[in-house]
Curated annotation (Swiss-Prot):
GO terms for cellular component: cytoplasm. Homodimer. This is Phosphoribosyl-AMP cyclohydrolase. The gene is hisI. Keywords: Amino-acid biosynthesis, Cytoplasm, Histidine biosynthesis, Hydrolase, Magnesium, Metal-binding, Zinc. It comes from Saccharopolyspora erythraea (strain ATCC 11635 / DSM 40517 / JCM 4748 / NBRC 13426 / NCIMB 8594 / NRRL 2338).
Amino acid sequence: MSSGLDPAIAARLKRTPDGLVAAVAQQRGTGEVLMMAWMDDEALHRTLTTRKGTYYSRSRQQYWVKGETSGHTQHVHEVRLDCDGDTVLLVVDQVDGACHTGDRTCFDADVLLAES
């Protein structure tokens, strides 16, 4: 599938063998890490043009817009590329839970190490 992603941006991406880059969503204002998902060039293009968090589902092999069915939307304020080009950071306003479980973040349920 051809993507409308700016070729200058596409050239900077370092993709997995499946053509994906990691995408981390962070709450604007607090810096809270909400979730991690995958994007290909088209998902990134859609996110940049619509300001809606748009991702690629590896299991379903299709695009999904965060909150399209749940109402738990993400309005994207910034998109940044990390220094290696293999991860994008989306700074968002998250409506309700970001995790598919309903939790605020995908990192709420399983703490492996915490300060005592």
